Design a protein with these regions (language model features):
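Helix-loop boundary and gating motifs at the non-cytosolic
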Residues: 3-51, 200-203, 207, 215-224, ...
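Residue-level signature of mid-helix packing/kink "hotspots" within the transmembrane helices
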Residues: 51-59, 143-144
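Structural signature of the two symmetry-related core transmembrane helices
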Residues: 72-86, 165
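Helix-breaking motifs and short loop linkers at transmembrane-helix boundaries and internal kinks
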Residues: 69, 90-93
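Cytoplasmic helix-loop-helix junction between adjacent transmembrane helices
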Residues: 102-137
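Helix-to-loop junctions at the C-terminal end of transmembrane segments
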Residues: 57-70, 154
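Paired small-residue
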Residues: 95-103
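C-terminal membrane-cytosol helix-exit motif in multi-pass small-molecule transporters
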Residues: 150-151, 165-185
Length: 234
């Protein structure tokens, strides 16, 4: 267990930065959308682009990793995510932001796939649950810290967008400097939804409802709070 954690510290640190930026970005865009007077329909449409990108990325990422490897994929899509948030601050329109959210979704699912396949390869059946639980604590803890960074500067300014980009870029440093070899890519045949349901009906159904609730909370909670005249600190 300790050996796995020692060999994966760069990945944990990199994902901590990624999720800090992700948590910051989600709250920032929600608050800014209200300040720009986007309609609720436009805001919901814009924020849903992330999950459309998630589906697209999930279908394409195995082929990309098989061609260029884990580290290059992580670096490329973290760089793309860093670039995208800066474009948000320049082109302020619901449809443009929707397209940018699609690209963000693609980037994030690629990053998640690299991280979780890496950890899965490094761990065994005996310690995989413990390793992944630490990974999840880091993810959600970092996301919470990122949301608090909304107090750094007013969402109307450029500075919060720049800070998200800086944090995302910082995630590249430990990953690119690690001496540990990435896992060998093992391409697995995709499962259909019916096959997945037969394999784990409870897991599939519970994941669907969990994702529905989580996506609403993480994407629209800041919108609701701002509409109810909560302060940024609150």
């Amino acid at each position: 267990m300790n050996k796995v954690l020692k060999n994966s510290w760069a990945l944990f640190l990199g994902m901590g930065f990624i999720m800090m930026a992700y948590g910051f970005q989600g709250s920032l865009l929600g608050v800014r959308a209200v300040q720009e007077e986007f309609s609720l329909t436009a805001t919901g449409f814009m924020m849903s682009g992330y999950f459309i990108g998630y589906f697209i990325g999930a279908a394409t990422i195995p082929n990309i990793i098989s061609r260029v490897g884990h580290i290059r994929v992580f670096a490329a899509f973290a760089s793309l995510a860093s670039l995208i948030i800066l474009v948000h601050s320049i082109l302020i329109h619901p449809f443009v932001w929707f397209l940018l959210r699609v690209l963000t979704g693609i980037s994030m699912v690629c990053i998640y796939t690299v991280a979780e396949s890496w950890l899965n390869d490094r761990s065994s059946n005996k310690n995989r649950g413990s390793v992944l639980s630490i990974y999840m604590v880091i993810l959600y803890g970092s996301m919470g810290v990122g949301m608090f960074l909304l107090n750094f500067s007013a969402p109307k300014n450029f500075e919060p967008f720049i800070l998200v980009s800086v944090i995302t870029s910082a995630a590249l440093i430990p990953i690119l400097l690690t001496k540990k070899k990435p896992p060998t890519f093992k391409k697995i045949n995709a499962m259909s939804f019916s096959e997945l349901y037969k394999s784990s009906p409870f897991g599939m159904v519970s994941s669907f409802f969990y994702g529905t609730i989580q996506s609403a909370l993480f994407t629209l909670l800041a919108v609701y709070a701002t509409s109810m005249n909560f302060t940024i600190l609150e």
